Structure formats: structure tokens, C-alpha cells
């Protein structure tokens, strides 16, 4: 009985030891070491010797330095603008963020230095232990983990070139120079000679509005032009100027092709059309506008200019007056970049002679000043009398076809010396006049050539051909000096094309309140030079510091002539030498 009890106790002790051993075995899990050994053996079979010798990051500091200096040399351009937006955001949307630090000046890397930090939100299923992750080159990535054979440098040049090309592709792009100058000139119609220039970056002056009523940048006094006819905008996406018809009644053409809405007269806008240099815009049937486009500011005028004109129709008992005035200005003249021309012509017997003269005068003057000797003579002597006299003679010689048509001509020549001071000299035929305000007083730059004027009566008397009592016209013409009128000039020697030429005026840079007013007799018949100057001074004070004040002043003088009930065509050029306003 005792033996049976001892056997039971022994068996119980063995079971307890076995249970304790099992508990220890399960707690320690020794089988996991066998699993790791098998896995490690399998992984190690996929390694190559070259992979064990290849580091995760190149330890050649010169490589990274060379790449950085190359990018700087390619893209550090003076005056260049860069687009930086969007380079980082594209990486974030792909679930990857890359951060790159510039390498130190030392070719060796110190401990703790950070080169590339990579965070990957999408783990690779095929990645093996110790293997370098190769990420595909993606647009917008700022850095990439590299593999580099440091043992024999066999791939150094290839890797360098590939990385350089990749960095160049990923670097910020140079933004194209968006500056573009638009120049418009009316070459046909009642407002012939009117000009306007604008820069694509002058957002406050855009769009350019073409129409008959204010506020139009190109104010066209043509009954066929709608109040708001068309406008020109700068398309910053295409880098192009675009013209759109604003629902005009008589339509808009570009190079004889309509750009208006198909339902003409519906007041619906047309589609935008790209403009190119040398295009011709036709508004209605008579007004034509020449287009020039340049990437450089070749149209900049060193003073402010305002132009205004009105045929003053319905002033004579309800009879419509044809527009025979033409005005024109050009700065600089071709081949004479320090010279500019301002001209008003008033036709009689028709507008043909005036329109011919306004085209011939700038051409002849530019040809004369293209002679370097004559140009230098003007600059050195500060006097252009010979040039102006020659210009009128050559213009008159080219008007042979105008036997019964003539026109006045008032030409203001402005030039700049090497010290940036201006000079102004005027020549005229007829009764269109020019006045300049300088030094607190106004200066008459022209002479009145009407038959009844004192200067002409004196000239007749000196030639022994005095006027008879009560005689105020010759061959029905109230002018004694003009361009054209070839037949009357052949019949009466008192007619002349010899211009009056003023003394040159010097306008220093420091001069203030300097301006000129050129106008046809529609203004001067009802507004004296003194009153015109007073009106300008008042308007200058009111408009001081505002944009387009020159245009407003020109229109202000025109409104004064209208209020004074002028009965003749009126054209005005206002020239302000004080650009600080």
C-alpha cells in the first residue's frame, strides 16, 4: 500500500515537471529562431557581391557639389523671373515628400549631416532587406535616392549626366518676357493721324477701347463708328493681343475679314481675334487703324500727348460740314531717334491736299534728317530752320496733282540734345496756329497768313501788289500762303508756299508748366491764344496726378470751342513737356 502511494506521488511530480517545461517552452518560443534562420538563408541567396559593397547613399561629396554648381550656372540669370509655385505640391499629391539640403562646402561629409530624407507612404511589396529603393523620376520631385559604384567609378560620368539632366528638367522654368508694346495709328478716316501706344504690363490702361465717345483710348470722331465699337486686350496665357467687336452697328474688319458677330446689328459681341504686327483694322467703312506690335518700347514718347477733333457739323444753318482737318504726330522719326514731329493741316476745297500733305511731310522730314551731316548741324547749332524750309519746299513739289485743293500746314519739330534738354521750333503756312507756354508766359510760334493779316498786306505792298479797298480774298480763298492750290498760284503771284519759321525754344529738364497747343482755325476763331493757355493751366491743376490728363485737356479745349459756337472743323494737339504731372 505504501509502495502504491509512492508511485502515485512520483508520477504526479513527473507530470508537474512536464507541465512546467511546456509552459517554459511556450513562453520562450524557441522555434522562432529556426524560422528566422531559414528566412535569412533564403534572403542571403539573392544578394550579389556588388550589392554588399554598394552604399545606400554616395559617399562622394564632389558629385553632389558638381551637380549643384551646374544648376546654378544654368539658371542664375540676371533679371530672370522664376515660377516656383507647384514644385512641392505635385510631390505631396503622390504620397511622397522629398526634402533636400544643400551640401557643405567641404567635399567630405561630417557626422550627423543630413543629405536626403525620404518618407514613403506606400511600402513596396517586393523590397528586399538591404536593397536600395529606386524611385521612378517624377515631374515635381526635388530629390532622388541614388545608387553609385564607389569602388571603380565606372558609372560616374553617366550617373552625373543623368542626374544633371533630371535636375535641369525639374528646376524652375524661366518665364518668357511678357512685355509687349501695342502701337495703333489711324491711317484713314476723319481721325487720321491719331495714335495710341500701350504696354501689356500696364493693367490700369487695359483693355484699349476704340469708339466714338469717352472714355475711349482711341477716340474716333466718325459717324460710322459706334460709341463703344471694339476693344483690344492682352491675353496673358497666349502672350497675344486680341481684338473683339463689342456689338458695333457697322462692324469691324481685320485685313478685310469680318470679326463681328454673324448677326450684325444685334449688339452681340464677336469672338476674340489675335492681332499681329502690320494688321489693318477697319471700323465701319472709312476709319482704318494700323497695328504694330513690338517686344521693346520703341513707341515710348518722352512727353504726354492729347489729340481731339470734331467736324462741328450742323453749325451752318443745318448744313453738314465735311471734315477737312488732319493731324498727325510721330516720335521718334525713322532714322532720327532724337527728333519728333507734330502737325496739323486744314484743307480747303476738299480734304485731298491735307491728307496728301500729312503723309508726305513725315516722310520728307525723315529723309532729310537721315543725312547725318544735316542732323548733326541741327544738334550743334540748335536750329532747324534750313531743315524746315527744305521740308516745305519738297512737300509742295509733290502736290502737283492738287490744282484746286490746298491746305494749311503747321509743323512743330521737337528734338533732344545730348543733355536730355528739348528744343522746339515751328514752321507754318496758313492760319492753323501753335502756342507754347514757357517760363510763365505764352509764346506765339506761328504767323497768320490770311489775306487780311498785317504780315500779308505788308508783303503784298512790298511786292507792289497791294490789296484793293475791301478786298479780303484772292480767287475766293482767304489764305495767301498754303500748300497745293497749284492753279491759283499760277494765276496770282501773291500766293506763296514760303513758310514762316519761328525761333527755336530751349526747354530745360528743370522747366515746369511747359506745354504746346497746335490747332486749326476752328479753335483760334473763337478762343484767343491767351485764353487757351489760361484754360490749359486751370485744367492742369484740376487733372494733376491723374492718368490721361493730356487727352482730357485736349478735349477740354475742344469743348470750349464747341461752347463758343465755332463754325469750322476743329482739330487740336496738346503736348505736355512736364511728365511729372
From Swiss-Prot:
Group of enzyme by EC: hydrolase
Membrane topology (Extracellular): 1-7
Membrane-side (Cytoplasmic) residue stretches: 29-581
A GO-annotated cellular component: plasma membrane
Disruption phenotype: No visible phenotype under normal growth conditions, but mutant seedlings show increased sensitivity of roots to salt stress.
EC number: 3.1.3.16
Stretches that traverse the bilayer: 8-28
Superkingdom as given in the UniProt entry: Eukaryota
Record-linked SMART domains: FHA, PP2Cc
Molecular-function annotations in GO: [pyruvate kinase]-phosphatase activity; metal ion binding; protein serine/threonine phosphatase activity
InterPro entries: FHA_dom, Kinase_assoc_Pase, PP2C, PP2C_BS, PPM-type-like_dom_sf, PPM-type_phosphatase-like_dom, SMAD_FHA_dom_sf
Designated name of the protein: Protein phosphatase 2C 70
Residues binding Mn(2+) 1, per UniProt: 346-347
Tissue and organ expression note: Expressed in all tissues examined.
Keyword Magnesium: yes
Reactions the enzyme catalyzes: O-phospho-L-seryl-[protein] + H2O = L-seryl-[protein] + phosphate; O-phospho-L-threonyl-[protein] + H2O = L-threonyl-[protein] + phosphate
Subcellular location: Cell membrane
Organism: Arabidopsis thaliana
Amino acid at each position: 500500500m505504501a509502495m502504491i502511494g509512492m508511485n502515485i506521488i512520483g508520477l504526479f511530480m513527473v507530470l508537474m515537471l512536464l507541465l512546467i517545461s511546456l509552459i517554459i517552452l511556450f513562453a520562450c518560443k524557441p522555434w522562432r529562431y529556426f524560422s528566422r534562420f531559414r528566412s535569412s538563408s533564403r534572403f542571403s541567396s539573392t544578394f550579389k557581391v556588388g550589392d554588399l559593397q554598394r552604399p545606400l547613399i554616395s559617399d562622394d561629396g564632389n558629385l553632389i557639389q558638381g551637380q549643384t554648381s551646374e544648376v546654378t550656372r544654368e539658371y542664375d540669370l540676371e533679371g530672370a523671373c522664376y515660377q516656383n509655385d507647384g514644385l512641392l505640391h505635385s510631390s505631396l499629391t503622390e504620397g511622397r515628400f522629398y526634402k533636400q539640403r544643400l551640401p557643405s562646402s567641404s567635399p567630405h561629409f561630417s557626422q550627423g549631416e543630413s543629405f536626403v530624407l525620404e518618407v514613403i507612404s506606400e511600402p513596396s511589396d517586393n523590397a528586399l532587406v538591404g536593397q536600395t529603393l529606386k524611385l521612378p523620376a517624377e515631374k515635381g520631385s526635388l530629390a532622388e535616392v541614388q545608387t553609385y559604384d564607389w569602388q571603380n567609378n565606372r558609372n560616374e560620368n553617366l550617373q552625373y549626366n543623368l542626374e544633371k539632366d533630371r535636375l535641369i528638367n525639374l528646376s524652375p522654368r524661366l518665364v518668357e518676357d511678357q512685355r509687349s508694346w501695342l502701337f495703333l495709328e489711324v491711317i484713314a478716316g476723319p481721325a487720321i493721324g491719331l495714335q495710341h501706344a500701350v504696354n501689356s504690363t500696364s493693367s490700369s490702361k487695359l483693355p484699349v477701347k476704340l469708339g466714338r465717345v469717352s472714355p475711349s483710348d482711341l477716340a474716333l470722331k466718325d459717324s460710322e463708328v459706334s460709341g463703344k465699337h471694339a476693344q483690344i486686350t492682352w491675353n496673358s496665357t497666349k502672350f497675344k493681343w486680341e481684338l473683339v467687336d463689342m456689338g458695333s452697328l457697322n462692324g469691324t474688319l481685320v485685313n478685310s475679314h469680318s470679326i463681328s458677330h454673324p448677326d450684325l446689328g444685334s449688339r452681340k459681341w464677336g469672338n476674340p481675334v489675335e492681332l499681329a504686327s502690320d494688321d489693318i483694322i477697319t471700323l465701319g467703312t472709312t476709319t482704318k487703324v494700323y497695328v504694330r506690335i513690338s517686344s521693346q518700347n520703341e513707341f515710348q514718347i518722352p512727353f504726354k500727348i492729347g489729340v481731339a477733333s470734331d467736324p462741328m457739323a450742323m453749325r451752318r444753318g443745318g448744313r453738314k460740314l465735311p471734315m477737312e482737318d488732319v493731324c498727325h504726330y510721330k516720335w521718334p522719326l525713322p532714322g532720327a531717334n532724337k527728333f519728333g514731329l507734330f502737325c496739323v493741316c486744314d484743307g480747303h476745297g476738299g480734304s485731298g491736299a491735307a491728307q496728301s500733305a500729312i503723309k508726305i511731310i513725315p516722310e520728307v522730314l525723315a529723309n532729310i534728317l537721315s543725312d547725318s551731316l544735316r542732323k548733326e548741324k541741327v544738334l550743334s547749332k540748335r536750329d532747324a530752320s534750313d531743315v524746315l524750309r527744305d521740308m516745305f519746299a519738297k512737300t509742295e513739289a509733290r502736290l502737283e496733282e492738287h490744282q484746286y485743293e490746298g491746305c494749311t500746314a503747321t509743323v512743330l519739330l521737337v528734338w533732344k540734345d545730348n543733355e536730355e534738354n528739348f528744343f522746339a521750333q515751328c514752321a507754318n503756312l496758313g492760319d492753323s496756329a501753335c502756342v507754347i507756354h514757357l517760363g510763365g508766359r505764352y509764346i506765339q510760334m506761328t504767323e497768320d497768313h490770311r489775306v487780311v493779316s498785317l504780315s500779308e498786306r505788308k508783303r503784298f505792298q512790298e511786292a507792289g501788289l497791294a490789296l484793293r479797298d475791301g478786298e479780303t480774298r484772292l480767287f475766293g480763298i482767304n489764305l495767301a500762303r498754303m500748300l497745293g492750290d497749284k492753279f491759283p498760284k499760277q494765276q496770282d503771284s501773291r500766293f506763296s508756299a514760303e513758310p514762316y519759321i519761328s525761333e527755336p525754344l530751349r526747354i530745360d529738364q528743370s522747366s515746369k508748366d511747359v506745354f504746346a497747343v497746335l490747332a486749326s482755325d476752328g479753335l483760334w476763331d473763337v478762343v484767343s491764344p491767351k485764353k487757351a493757355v489760361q484754360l490749359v493751366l486751370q485744367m492742369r491743376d484740376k487733372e494733376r496726378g491723374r492718368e490721361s490728363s493730356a487727352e482730357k485737356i485736349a478735349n477740354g479745349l475742344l469743348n470750349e470751342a464747341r461752347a463758343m459756337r465755332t463754325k469750322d472743323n476743329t482739330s487740336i494737339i496738346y503736348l505736355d513737356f512736364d511728365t511729372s504731372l
